[in-house]
Every structure is written in C-alpha cells, then in structure tokens.
C-alpha cells in the first residue's frame, strides 16, 4: 500500500534512505559521500523545505520504500527515492514513482548522480528523458539548492521531456 508518511515515521524514512544509499558508496564522488548519507538534520531540513514523503508498506505494515515530492515554482521534483535493499527488484520503486507522477500535471524533474547508472536506467525505464548538460546545469541551479560540486556530478531527467 502507498500512503503519505506520517511525521512520527522520520526514523523509518531515515533508516530506508541510508540503507539504500549504501549503494552509492564508492560510486559517487568521495567528497560527496557522507556517513550517514543523509543526516537526521538534513532529513528534517528537507521536510521543512516542502519535501512530502510517500511510503510503500509491505504486508506487515512496515515501510520498505520511500519517495518524496517537492513542488518548486512550475515543476515538481522527485526527491530521495529509496527502497530497502532486501525489497529492491520487486517493483516497489516503480509503484511509488507511478503513484506520485499521476498526482500532478506539472513537469516532473529528477536529479541523481551521473555515476548512478542503475538510477538513471530506472527513471528512463519509467519514461523520463535525460536533459542536455547545459539544460541540466540551469535546472539544478534554478530548482535545487545544492552545491556547485553536486551540480557538476549530477544529471537531470524530465517527464515530459523538454523539446
């Protein structure tokens, strides 16, 4: 079942994000890796900035995947899409993404690490198109609040694609 996460589920969101983000270790630039990947303070800041997390519950009512949305001006950003490693490959991420993308008529943008080929492939398989490097820089500077180093090492995918 997919539902909005409750405020008292921040510990579960934190655990899912950091368990799944272990896949980035040694893949993303070393200067961008943190342990934990997302601190509790960063999670609280993301929620305060308007990221609304939805979660996927297993049959026992436990969250096994989370994905956030953040409306910013004229687009919606998909933020922090993570599924527990033991639950990956079972369609959880795809179901979350499909659910969240049907909730808006705005263009949807997703930023991820340029070296996270599995993530890029996942989004492409769900109809997202990677934008040009020039447009990527402009979009990341306009819609995200991230350091220049992260802009340089990221990609953006869009749906619908830019003409």
Model regions and ranges:
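A short helix-loop-beta-strand connector motif used in the catalytic cores of GNAT acetyltransferases and
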Residues: 38-55, 150-153
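Conserved GNAT acetyl-CoA-binding A-motif
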Residues: 102-115
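Conserved beta-strand in the GNAT
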Residues: 55, 62-70, 77-82
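A short beta-loop-alpha structural element at the N-terminal edge
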Residues: 1-15
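Conserved GNAT-fold acetyl-CoA-binding loop/helix
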Residues: 18-43
């Amino acid at each position: 079942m997919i539902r909005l996460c409750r405020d008292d589920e921040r510990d579960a969101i934190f655990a899912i994000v950091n368990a799944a983000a272990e896949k980035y270790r040694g893949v993303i630039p070393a200067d961008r890796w943190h342990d934990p990947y997302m601190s509790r303070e960063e999670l609280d800041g993301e929620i305060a900035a308007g990221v609304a997390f939805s979660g996927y519950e297993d049959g026992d009512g436990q969250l096994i995947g989370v994905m956030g949305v953040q409306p910013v001006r004229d687009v919606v950003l998909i933020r922090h899409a993570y599924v527990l490693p033991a639950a990956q490959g079972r369609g959880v991420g795809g179901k979350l993404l499909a659910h969240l993308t049907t909730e808006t008529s705005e263009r949807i943008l997703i930023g991820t690490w340029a070296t996270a080929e599995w993530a890029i492939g996942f989004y492409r398989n769900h109809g997202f198109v990677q934008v040009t490097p020039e447009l990527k820089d402009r979009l990341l500077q306009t819609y995200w609040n991230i350091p220049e180093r992260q802009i340089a090492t990221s990609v953006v995918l869009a749906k619908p694609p830019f003409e």
